[in-house]
């Protein structure tokens, strides 16, 4: 008894190869974090972001929040970094977001350069670097704000641009300039868990 040998036509082999290549191309075009947009629209997550690169530490003596020239501000690298972060977020599927920022100019400028929507100054995101005794009250205020914002905008991505001390107090995580922390929270706004997304660099 002879075994039958089936020969796949060359045109069919070529078609299969094309389909495989197309599948690989589509897979390669997917965002680096396919679930980021989904998480940010489930009413349980917020994206905390440390402001982009601003040379120096702290602020000059006598600085004023309503005068950017008296503060430590973004450098050219920080401005480029902010734009890259915005592009990265767009690549994850975010076309717009509710964006809130600390009153410090380096935070507000970072937020605006994301180009994902209007920026609203939110006091609970303000730094307490100058007075660490405010850490607990400021973090409690942030939790209250997060809870209220998620209730008001449950289906919109919520981006909060702030400072390293605020992010560490809220999540327990130390982050570099421009880094993002996707935080899952309880209904009262308190932290449950988080995932860090390192900032793209110029």
Give residue ranges: language-model regions.
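N-terminal secretory signal peptides that target proteins for export/translocation
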Residues: 1-12
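Bacterial N-terminal signal peptides
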Residues: 15-27
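Boundary at the C-terminal end of the N-terminal hydrophobic targeting segment
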Residues: 29-34
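Active-site-proximal alpha-helix that buttresses catalytic centers in soluble enzyme cores
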Residues: 35-123, 128-131, 137, 173-200
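Generic beta-sheet signal
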Residues: 44-46, 154-162
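Glycine-rich phosphate-binding loop signature in dinucleotide/nucleotide-binding domains
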Residues: 92-94, 149-155
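A short, acidic, amphipathic alpha-helical segment used as a generic capping/interface helix at domain edges
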Residues: 141-151
């Amino acid at each position: 008894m002879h075994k039958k040998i089936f020969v796949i036509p060359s045109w069919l082999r070529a078609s299969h190869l094309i389909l495989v290549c197309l599948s690989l191309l589509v897979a390669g075009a997917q965002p680096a974090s396919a679930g980021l947009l989904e998480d940010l629209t489930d009413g349980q997550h917020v994206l905390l972001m440390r402001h982009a690169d601003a040379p120096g530490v702290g602020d000059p003596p006598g600085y004023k929040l309503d005068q950017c020239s008296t503060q430590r501000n973004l450098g050219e690298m920080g401005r480029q970094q902010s734009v890259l972060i915005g592009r990265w977020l767009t690549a994850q599927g975010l076309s717009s977001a509710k964006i809130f920022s600390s009153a410090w100019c380096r935070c507000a400028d970072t937020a605006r350069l994301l180009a994902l929507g209007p920026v609203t100054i939110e006091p609970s995101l303000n730094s307490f670097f100058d007075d660490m005794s405010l850490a607990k009250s400021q973090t409690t205020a942030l939790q209250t704000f997060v809870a209220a914002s998620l209730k008001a905008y449950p289906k919109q991505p919520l981006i909060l641009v702030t400072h390293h001390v605020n992010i560490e107090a809220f999540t327990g995580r130390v982050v570099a300039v421009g880094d993002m922390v996707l935080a899952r929270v309880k209904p009262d706004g308190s932290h449950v868990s988080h995932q860090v997304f390192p900032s793209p660099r110029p």
